[in-house]
């Protein structure tokens, strides 16, 4: 995944370099946010978040019962171009940032509000991103088999 | 003169002043949470960890008709210089219009 964000930058004027970096970064990010239904740019990883706000974002998605195969995370601490590029891309100065079906949803504060209001659950359900709930009779079936 | 005075203000005061003027409100509560974050690895190498993390509650008529994302973006945009200058995080736990509060 990280290789997506490594480029060869030709030596040109600074403004040209910035423009080219920005264009390539933008294209990589546009692709990244569309490849999967739910994309979270965070500090650290889901199992080792490196800041409280990224932890909160992961906890909210976990509480919402998001299916693990629907969510992809990018660790911005592993790549400075990614860390700065995503802020420009979204016009949002902080990490974490959540995208659903390619659309920017918000940072940890907005996720918290949407989780509390039920709005986030509604969106995730509509796009079939929730893990299937275990049917109640499955335990009974198991018992019968025994 | 004014510029020099402005830059002697601490970050918390600058944030308050910027937002109160631009958003036409004095209903701003700003908490400094920096001490909670100073040990984070992401803060390694940051020279001044005393004014990096703030938490904001704000009421402004300028938010009328705006989505939550748009409201936060407006606030973040007004504080771009602070983010460029070392502000790491601004939690916005409440951004409402006067009508929404009453």
Swiss-Prot record, chain A:
The species this protein was found in: Schizosaccharomyces pombe (strain 972 / ATCC 24843) (Fission yeast)
Presence of the UniProt keyword Glycoprotein in the record: no
Function, in words: Monothiol glutaredoxin involved in mitochondrial iron-sulfur (Fe/S) cluster transfer. Receives 2Fe/2S clusters from scaffold protein isu1 and mediates their transfer to apoproteins, to the 4Fe/FS cluster biosynthesis machinery, or export from mitochondrion.
PROSITE patterns linked: GLUTAREDOXIN_2 (PS51354)
Subunit composition and interactions: Homodimer. Interacts with ISA1 and ISA2.
Keyword match Iron: yes
Gene Ontology biological process terms from the UniProt entry: [2Fe-2S] cluster assembly; [4Fe-4S] cluster assembly
GO-annotated cellular components: mitochondrial matrix; mitochondrion
Residues annotated as binding glutathione: 43, 83-87, 95, 108-109
Residue span, Glutaredoxin domain: 26-131
Main localization, broad class: mitochondrion
Induction: By nitrosative and osmotic stresses.
Protein's UniProt name: Monothiol glutaredoxin-5, mitochondrial
Entry-linked InterPro entries: Glutaredoxin, GRX_PICOT-like, Monothiol_GRX-rel, Thioredoxin-like_sf
GO MF entry, a single one: protein-disulfide reductase activity
Keywords noted in UniProt: 2Fe-2S, Iron, Iron-sulfur, Metal-binding, Mitochondrion, Redox-active center
Annotated residues for binding of [2Fe-2S] cluster: 51
Family affiliation: Belongs to the glutaredoxin family. Monothiol subfamily.
Locations listed in the record: Mitochondrion
Curated annotation (Swiss-Prot), chain B:
One GO BP: cell division
Gene3D superfamilies for this protein: BolA-like (3.30.300.90)
Keyword tags: Cell cycle, Cell division, Cytoplasm, Mitochondrion, Nucleus
GO CC, any one term: nucleus
Subcellular location(s) per record: Mitochondrion matrix; Cytoplasm; Nucleus
Disruption phenotype: Leads to delayed spore germination and the unidirectional cell extension is not followed by cell division. Proliferates faster with smaller cell size than the wild-type cell during vegetative growth, but no other significant cellular anomaly, such as defects in septation or cytokinesis are detected. Sensitive to UV light. Shows a normal cell cycle delay after UV irradiation, but displays aberrant septum formation and defects in cytokinesis when released from the UV damage checkpoint. However, chromosome segregation is not affected.
Induction, per UniProt: Expression shows cellular growth phase dependency, with the maximal expression at the diauxic shift. Expression is rapidly decreased when cells approach stationary phase. By UV light. Expressed maximally (3.2-fold) at 4 hours after exposure to 240 J/m(2) of UV light.
Transmembrane segments: none
Family matches, as InterPro entries: BolA, BolA-like_sf
The family this protein is said to belong to: Belongs to the BolA/IbaG family.
Described purpose of this protein according to its UniProt entry: Acts as a mitochondrial iron-sulfur (Fe-S) cluster assembly factor that facilitates [4Fe-4S] cluster insertion into a subset of mitochondrial proteins such as lipoyl synthase (LS) and succinate dehydrogenase (SDH). Required during the last step of iron-sulfur protein assembly when the iron-sulfur cluster is inserted into the target protein. Probably acts together with the monothiol glutaredoxin grx5. Not required for [2Fe-2S] cluster insertion into mitochondrial proteins. May be involved in control of cell division, especially during the resumption from cell cycle arrest.
Protein name: UV-induced protein uvi31
Taxonomic lineage of the native organism: Eukaryota, Fungi, Dikarya, Ascomycota, Taphrinomycotina
């Amino acid at each position: 995944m990280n290789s997506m964000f490594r480029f060869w930058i030709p030596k040109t004027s600074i403004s040209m370099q910035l423009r080219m970096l920005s264009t390539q970064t933008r294209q990589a990010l546009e692709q990244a946010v569309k490849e999967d239904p739910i994309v979270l740019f965070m500090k650290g990883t889901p199992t080792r978040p490196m800041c409280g706000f990224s932890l909160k974002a992961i906890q909210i998605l976990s509480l919402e019962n998001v299916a693990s195969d629907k969510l992809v995370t990018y660790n911005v601490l592993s790549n400075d171009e990614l860390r700065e590029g995503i802020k420009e891309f979204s016009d949002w100065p902080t990490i974490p940032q959540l995208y659903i079906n390619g659309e920017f949803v918000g940072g940890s504060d907005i996720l918290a509000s949407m989780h509390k209001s039920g709005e986030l659950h509604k969106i995730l359900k509509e796009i079939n991103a929730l893990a299937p709930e275990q049917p109640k009779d499955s335990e009974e079936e198991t018992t019968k088999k025994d | 003169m004014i510029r020099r005075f402005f830059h002697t203000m601490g970050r918390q005061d600058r944030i308050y002043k910027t937002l109160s003027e631009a958003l036409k409100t004095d209903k701003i509560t700003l908490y400094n949470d920096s001490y909670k974050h100073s040990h984070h690895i992401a803060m390694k190498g940051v020279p001044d960890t005393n004014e990096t993390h703030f938490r904001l509650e704000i009421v402004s008529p300028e938010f009328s008709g705006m989505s939550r994302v748009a409201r936060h973006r407006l606030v973040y945009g007004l504080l771009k210089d602070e983010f460029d200058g070392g502000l790491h995080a601004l939690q916005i736990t409440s951004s409402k219009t006067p009508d929404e509060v009453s």
